[in-house]
Design a protein with these regions (language model features):
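An N-cap/entry alpha-helix motif that binds or orients negatively charged groups
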Residues: 1-62
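Acidic (Asp/Glu)-rich catalytic clusters
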Residues: 57-61, 109-116, 137-143, 203-206
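Active-site cofactor/substrate anionic-group-binding motifs, chiefly glycine-
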Residues: 57-105
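A gly/proline- and charged-residue-enriched helix-loop-helix capping module
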Residues: 89-129
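Alpha/beta enzyme core
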Residues: 90, 94, 127-246, 252-274, ...
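Short beta-alpha connecting loops at secondary-structure transitions
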Residues: 273-283
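Charged C-terminal helix
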Residues: 293-317
Length: 317
């Protein structure tokens, strides 16, 4: 079964575009924010210099370890003249950042790739694996630099396999993951890793990168990615797997903390969503520049000269 471009999709409209957390005890986003805010840094200014933010990912050089998020469906807003998915891809291209795209049909994904930003396609864990393989092949043919799967988007709130836009999700076993990884020559990303166990399985399956994430609180009472990062980094020591992270990165200071804790690069989502919907590409660029300034500031205060020399001993929590 291949995704039908005309498939009906439920969509809450522009008012529902901004993710809202429940604020209840099970809301992983609340625990994530609290954990990040309790991480403090020591100052190391003697011999400190203005840092170099350039970062290598999948053999390509980018201006910063801050990346775009894997948004989905933003082009469904009522204003047909505005294409947010393309707008943030254009921002990524202009700022030389790695772009990510989530669940989109092939036509829409092709339009995003036409912007010519360096883009990773993240695919849902469809129960029908033919959809996964088809979307991987399309990404290969149209110039994506990597592909991956939202391995954490399996369970729905009803305790059954989730259904997204009418498409059933399904489990991804280690055997499944190995088979899918072997079907592509592109670097493969497992997005939604929140344990050493899954990190090691992703590595065993041949993934070239993982995203340490709870997918904006999909799992109730989920641990913060920042909390999981150090153990995952230690477990993957000696491998060539890239470790990315996301969830609640609202500033360059937040980005700094995750980078120090073990991430090679981080994705920002909600921090750019409002500027994206209000001002398009220019709003995203403005926000990213602010985050770059904050990241550079904190790196300079702590004597970090580049994105390859973060020192976890700087943090106190």
């Amino acid at each position: 079964m291949i995704m039908d471009n005309q498939a009906k999709q439920q969509w809450p409209g522009p008012a529902g575009l901004i993710p809202v957390t429940s604020g209840k005890a099970e809301d992983a986003n609340i625990h994530n924010r609290n954990f990040l805010d309790h991480i403090l840094v020591e100052m190391r200014v003697i011999d400190a210099t203005e840092p170099d933010l350039t970062t290598e990912i999948f053999g390509q050089k980018f201006s910063s370890p801050i990346m775009m998020p894997a948004f989905s469906h933003l082009n469904k807003i009522k204003n047909k003249d505005v294409k947010p998915m393309e707008e943030y891809a254009m921002a990524a291209k202009e700022e030389n950042l790695l772009n990510w795209v989530g669940m989109e049909n092939d036509d829409d994904f092709g339009n995003i790739l036409a912007v010519n930003s360096k883009t990773v396609r993240i695919i849902k864990p469809f129960a029908d694996h033919d959809i996964i393989l088809h979307q991987i092949a399309f990404a290969e043919q149209h110039g994506a630099i990597a592909v991956g799967i939202d391995i954490d988007h399996i369970a729905g709130t009803n305790g059954k396999y989730d259904v997204v836009d009418g498409y059933p999700m399904g489990p991804i076993t280690l055997k499944d993951l190995k088979t899918i990884v072997e079907k592509t020559h592109l670097p493969f990303v497992a997005k939604g890793v929140l344990s050493v166990s899954d990190a090691l399985k992703a590595c065993e399956a041949g993934c070239k990168a993982i995203v340490v994430s709870h997918h904006h609180g999909r799992i109730p009472f989920g641990i913060p990615p920042a909390y999981a990062l150090p153990k995952i980094k230690d477990a993957l020591a000696g491998s060539d797997i890239k470790i990315f992270a996301d969830c609640g990165i609202e500033s360059g200071y937040d980005a700094y903390k995750l980078l120090v804790l073990g991430a090679d690069a981080v994705s920002v989502g909600r921090a750019i969503l409002s500027p994206l919907l209000k001002e398009g590409k220019n709003g995203v660029i403005k926000q990213i520049k602010k985050m770059h300034a904050e990241l550079s500031e904190l790196m300079m205060y702590t004597g970090i000269k580049d994105t390859r020399t973060f020192d976890a001993n700087i943090l106190h929590y």
